[in-house]
Amino acid sequence: MTHPELLRLRDSIDNIDAALIHMLAERFKCTQAVGEYKASHDLPPADPSREAAQIARLRELAEKAKLDPDFAEKFLNFIVKEVIRHHEAIAKAGRT
């Protein structure tokens, strides 16, 4: 038995998931360039003040969008950790 409304909702979720993946890929292209810039200018991979500002900004955006700000912060922290890991790898590759 099919449920057309459920299928429609799931199609919407699938489309949003695809958009999220594409947006994350674009974000990582930008952070890759940031990592290369930092490595070439001897800057540290992490920038705690920038990260704190980003978290505050994302929490505010989440509240306005009626999304749990704690969830948004956890999501951004996960992304930031991965970005820092990439930046560290870029810096290490530049030193070898």
Role assignments for model-derived ranges:
Residues 1-96:
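Domain-level signature for soluble enzymes in the chorismate/prephenate branch of the shikimate pathway
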